[in-house]
């Protein structure tokens, strides 16, 4: 603390000087609590108030704080509420609980009251190093490969799904069937995996289909998946045909467009016998519901659904299945061709 030398007249020479210690203002740690003098509102002048008090290092962390009792005009707490309306007294009690004011009236929140993230506190930032340039982060597919889940081709995924689905059954229905108690009504056959294994395999195949962008795979039926497999040019569900189909000769004479679009009876039979019990339903239609109206077809269910979706039949047409012959005609607006694909 600074010391001041005071000389009393008639007591002695300058050598007989007494040292009188004058106390400074009390320094209060802002973290220790609220209270203490030094306010600009009720502060009393000391003997050395006109002198500089920066005798310390100049970087001290202690400073004068404002006590709540140093603020004039505060009200004491009365009733908490009246008539359902909350009454808040005019005082700094809540502010003092969460922080403090300095002598200049600036408000500071307590450090302990600040919200902390436990997850960030548990991170050891020393161990985290900057990733070297050129090193890319492993993707989700690579992480799955490291866990033993190898990526499969689209053909392998569809073939695996067809092995686990029943006719007219969706992927979601198969998951419910395999996940039920007992894994379905059918018993486990010789060499057939158990229901939990089939459930895990079906779930993994469906997840890979979703990862490839097919978000509606859980609502697709076995027949729809078989049509998609046929679209890939694969015929793995039926018996293997060693003789390849005849191809068109580029030097041959031009064929009529009707011959290319209209399937022959042989092609029709191959389409029906292709697959494990899968039958491609063929349709024929006419524009008017009269006996002498011209018939068009046959066409596949997928082709009919495409025309309906694109609005080629705004008023609807009268169509019927090709098999059995001589069936009744129905309006296309009442038929959902997706059920037959």
Curated annotation (Swiss-Prot):
Pfam family of the protein (one): GYF
Keyword annotations: Acetylation, Cytoplasm, Isopeptide bond, mRNA processing, mRNA splicing, Nucleus, Phosphoprotein, Ubl conjugation
Residues covered by region (Disordered): 1-66, 131-151, 178-199
InterPro entries associated with the record: CD2BP2/Lin1, GYF, GYF-like_dom_sf
GO CC terms: cytoplasm; cytosol; fibrillar center; nuclear speck; nucleoplasm; nucleus; U5 snRNP
Residues covered by the GYF domain: 280-338
Comp. bias regions, Acidic residues: 49-58
Protein name, per record: CD2 antigen cytoplasmic tail-binding protein 2
Function description: Involved in pre-mRNA splicing as component of the U5 snRNP complex that is involved in spliceosome assembly.
Subunit comment: Component of the U5 snRNP complex composed of the U5 snRNA and at least PRPF6, PRPF8, SNRNP200, EFTUD2, SNRNP40, DDX23, TXNL4A and CD2BP2. Interacts directly with TXNL4A and PRPF6. Interacts (via GYF domain) with CD2 (via Pro-rich sequence in the cytoplasmic domain). Interacts with PQBP1.
N6-acetyllysine modification, residue list: 44
Protein source organism: Homo sapiens
Cross-link (Glycyl lysine isopeptide (Lys-Gly) (interchain with G-Cter in SUMO2)): 26
Native organism taxonomy: Eukaryota, Metazoa, Chordata, Craniata, Vertebrata
GO molecular function: ribonucleoprotein complex binding
Region forming the signal peptide: none
Places the protein is found: Cytoplasm; Nucleus
BP GO terms, sorted: spliceosomal tri-snRNP complex assembly
Modified residues (Phosphoserine): 46, 49, 118, 194-195
